[in-house]
């Protein structure tokens, strides 16, 4: 659709800082560039969760404030029961969100015939937990144990739906 009803302007890469002052500075620069370019719409993604959710929401809010329509593309982590707030930060401007799936979903992984490496650290990995390894060699763990399983760039077919 580029050149017909949409014009792709480009990609803005920004970092996800640890300190609040750096987060503010980075998101200020993103919004300033969006305003300078006269962009009507923005897709904002993030990598990670928790602390990076603040960067996501700051970018959303500030791009909205300079007049851009914003759609967030992110994964969610609402806890094993699915009832917790799925993103660690929020802003009222975040009113259009595409979910790439939820990383806390517990998945059953059948036993493998051959294992390369060790299972010694599975229970300590993100997504693993004490007791996730079963006696028959299978495993029940959160989806996020598979690195990039819910990557917020949308390279998968996972989604979270609200009914």
Tell what function each PLM region has:
Residues 1-163:
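Anaerobic metallocofactor- and corrinoid-dependent redox/one-carbon enzyme cores
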């Amino acid at each position: 659709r580029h050149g017909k009803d949409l014009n792709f302007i480009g990609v803005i890469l920004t970092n996800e800082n640890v300190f609040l002052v750096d987060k503010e500075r980075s998101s200020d620069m993103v919004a300033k560039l969006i305003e300078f370019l006269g962009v009507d719409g923005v897709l904002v993604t993030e990598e990670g969760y928790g602390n990076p959710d603040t960067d996501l929401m700051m970018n959303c809010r500030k791009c909205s404030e300079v007049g851009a329509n914003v759609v967030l593309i992110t994964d969610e982590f609402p806890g094993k029961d699915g009832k917790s707030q799925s993103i660690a930060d929020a802003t009222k401007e975040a009113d259009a969100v595409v979910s790439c799936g939820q990383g806390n979903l517990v998945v059953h992984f059948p036993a493998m015939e051959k294992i390369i490496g060790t299972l010694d650290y599975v229970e300590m990995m993100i997504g693993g937990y004490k007791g996730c390894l079963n006696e028959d060699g299978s495993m029940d763990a959160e989806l996020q144990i598979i690195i990039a399983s819910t990557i917020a760039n949308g390279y998968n077919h996972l989604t979270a739906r609200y009914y």
